[in-house]
Amino acid sequence: MSDARVPPQGERRAVGFVGLGQMGAPMATHLAGRGLAVYDARAEAMAPLVKAGARAARSVAEVAAHCDLVSVMVRDDAQVTEVGEEVLASARPGTVLAVHSTIRARTAEDLASRARRYGIEVVDAPVSGGFMGASAGSLAVMVGGSDEAFERCREPFGAWADLVLHMGPVGAGTRAKLARNMLHFISFTAAAEAQRLAEAAGVSLRKLGRVVRHTDAITGGAGSIMLRPTTAPLEPDDDLYDILRHTRDLGEKDLALALELADELGVDTPLARIALDRFGAGLGLVGEAND
């Protein structure tokens, strides 16, 4: 790879990417023809990016020294802190360090606090959409940082994301990602509970899965009710009041029917019972009886 190294000091490269794993590699690929510098501890991970037009660096420090924006997609808080410190030690003032890993918000905030002493800005910019979204360049990215840093990141992030949103100050992107992933993984547990009920009832799980994927693509799934700016109780004159009251009535009816079937079949469905108990309140219909 000696012919594909980052240029010497003095020639400034715009974008660098550190961490070329399952998510980082496809994200970086969308930037490869745009003067991208990359680094990964595994040389074999850099080879496809070099073939696509990127330049391989010998170290994190080498990427940081030549790039105005350094994106980092590594495993956890410890790796983010380690890589972040290497970037701070080598980057020039004015550099933006973008952390795409899912970590604690405090880790991003602490890194940003240290970075300010070097004149470097940090944005926490975790992504949602998985490997398929990264490969297609259709991820959603939730950015926490200053207005100026966000504007500098918006265009390069758009190379691999269809939705680039400024969530607030540093830490806000990570908090949004944790809430989003909480919904995602709770839904997996709910799916397992629904499958147990369907299996006990003699329903084909594969066919049921096809139905779920098909209809969620049409309705938007759980995101279809995430339309309000607050979780406070709805006022009767709210534009969404009648819509969500109708949703509440249908949901409570169908949950009750599912629980009745579960009781008949002896299937334990604790999440469904919690959902029925809290469904109306969750929609903002507190203390309002069904019609």
Where are each of the predicted segments found?
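NAD(P)+-binding Rossmann beta1-loop-alpha1 motif at the extreme N-terminus of oxidoreductases
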Residues: M1-V72, G94-T95, H166, A200
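Rossmann-fold dinucleotide-binding core
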Residues: V15-V18, T102-N181
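Hydrophobic beta-strand scaffold residues
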Residues: L36, A56, E121-V123, L205, ...
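Short, hinge-like loop/turn segments at secondary-structure boundaries
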Residues: A54-A57, M73-V74, A89, R116-R117, ...
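Rossmann-fold NAD(P) dinucleotide-binding segment
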Residues: V60-E121
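Helical "substrate-binding/catalytic lid" subdomain
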Residues: G173-V267, L271, R278-D291
